[in-house]
């Protein structure tokens, strides 16, 4: 290899190392938010994380969804229904943006340690096929979950996720439900919630802070 080529190669290697170093430094120096700062951004962590009693639901692929599915990663659960006209699609769009931002930042570990679950509280209309088609419009990583009304009510109660069927003027019904995003830690414990209004950048920073603080 002649001197000119060697110099070019060394300069390219040095440039790549500089870029990677800058990226690594920018990730490391991101400020972690404490509980006070998290609350100011709408994320509320419980003083003591709560164990979740055994439950059994079904995901949109027909696979059982139970406590073991919540272990080993951070989970963000949103309770809603596919016929929801506003807050559900908006919230799922925001959560999809969180995934996209993690991917764009080149942080596959953090992305792989995050799982979004959409828990339908309208089992009469939201079967597996309906859930799967609905969620595909937001992210291929999202998992839809549902079950009997009784099982859903018991599961939601553990996570302070209230919902109620309300008759509408057309003889049908809508579902009144919480707008909070529920946080479950990698040990499968109820860790807190994120209040409305939801913002992708704030949720992203909250997630990074929780993931790095443990």
List where the protein language model places each region.
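Structural alpha/beta surface segment adjacent to cysteine/selenocysteine redox centers
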Residues: 75, 83, 112-140
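Short active-site neighborhood of thiol/selenol oxidoreductases, capturing the structured segment around
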Residues: 65-95
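N-terminal targeting signals for export/organelle localization
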Residues: 1-54, 213-214
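Conserved helix-turn-beta segment immediately C-terminal to the redox Cys motif
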Residues: 92-116
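Short extracytoplasmic
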Residues: 39-75
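Extracytoplasmic
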Residues: 50-52, 70-74, 111-116, 126, ...
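Thiol-/selenol-based redox modules, centered on thioredoxin-like
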Residues: 167-214
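Short, internal strand/loop/helix patches
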Residues: 117, 130-178
């Amino acid at each position: 290899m002649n001197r000119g080529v060697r110099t070019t190669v060394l300069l390219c290697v040095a440039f790549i190392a500089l870029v990677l170093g800058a990226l690594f430094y920018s990730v490391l120096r991101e400020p972690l938010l404490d509980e006070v700062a998290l609350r100011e951004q709408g994320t509320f962590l419980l003083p003591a994380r709560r164990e979740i009693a055994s439950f059994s639901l079904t995901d949109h692929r027909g696979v059982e969804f139970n406590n073991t599915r919540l272990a080993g990663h951070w989970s963000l659960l949103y309770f809603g229904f596919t016929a929801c006209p506003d807050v559900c699609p908006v919230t799922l769009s925001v959560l999809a943006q969180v995934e996209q931002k993690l991917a764009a930042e080149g942080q596959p570990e953090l992305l792989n340690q995050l799982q979004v679950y959409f828990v339908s509280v309208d089992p009469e209309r939201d079967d597996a096929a309906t859930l799967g088609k609905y969620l595909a419009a937001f992210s291929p990583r999202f998992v839809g979950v549902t079950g009997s009304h009784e099982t859903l009510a018991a599961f939601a109660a553990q996570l302070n996720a209230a919902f109620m069927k309300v008759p509408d003027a057309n003889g049908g019904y809508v579902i009144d439900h919480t707008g909070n995003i529920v946080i479950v830690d990698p040990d499968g414990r109820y860790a807190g919630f994120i209040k409305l209004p939801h913002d992708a950048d704030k949720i992203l920073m909250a997630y990074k802070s929780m993931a790095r603080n443990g």
